[in-house]
Amino acid sequence: MGGTADFVLSITIVLVILIIIAFIWYNFTGWSPFKYSKGNTVTFKTPDESSIAYMRFRNCIFTFTDPKGSLHSIDVTEVLNNMAKGFRDAQNPPSSFTLGGHCQAPLNAFSFVLPGVNDRATVATADDAKKWENCDATLTGLQRII
């Protein structure tokens, strides 16, 4: 009975060590920083032409100023991860995707919406939208292929 218990204990220890190594590998290696500023076309591309569905994002923050000069930030990590995961079931998944889709709109204060600040109801007229033209916007975060 002692031999079986020792075997189970050693297997458990090995599995715990492997889980710790996998956790460290995923969280602390392979993440590449990115930064896009106002006017940049935001395109995420896999380095080896693999499917974009395997790209993951972390700590992605969209920051913008409003016409009054107030600074606003939104965590868009989940949005970007869901955009990439959306290609999982595609017949021929691409190796890149661009914010704005086929329009390839450059990064601006409307690239992501913060309700009550830069949404359609708040920016109701063309004059309101024109005030936003000179507002700064940045998108920063980390990306990796899993």
UniProtKB/Swiss-Prot annotation:
Parts of the chain that traverse the membrane: 7-27
Coiled coil: none
UniProt KW keywords: Host membrane, Membrane, Transmembrane, Transmembrane helix, Virion
Membrane topology classification: Single-pass membrane protein
Primary location class: host cell
Induction: Expressed in the late phase of the viral replicative cycle.
Location within or outside the cell: Host membrane; Virion
GO CC aspect terms: host cell membrane; membrane; virion component
Top-level taxon: Viruses
Family that this chain belongs to: Belongs to the asfivirus E146L family.
UniProt name for this protein: Uncharacterized protein E146L
Organism this protein belongs to: African swine fever virus (isolate Tick/South Africa/Pretoriuskop Pr4/1996) (ASFV)
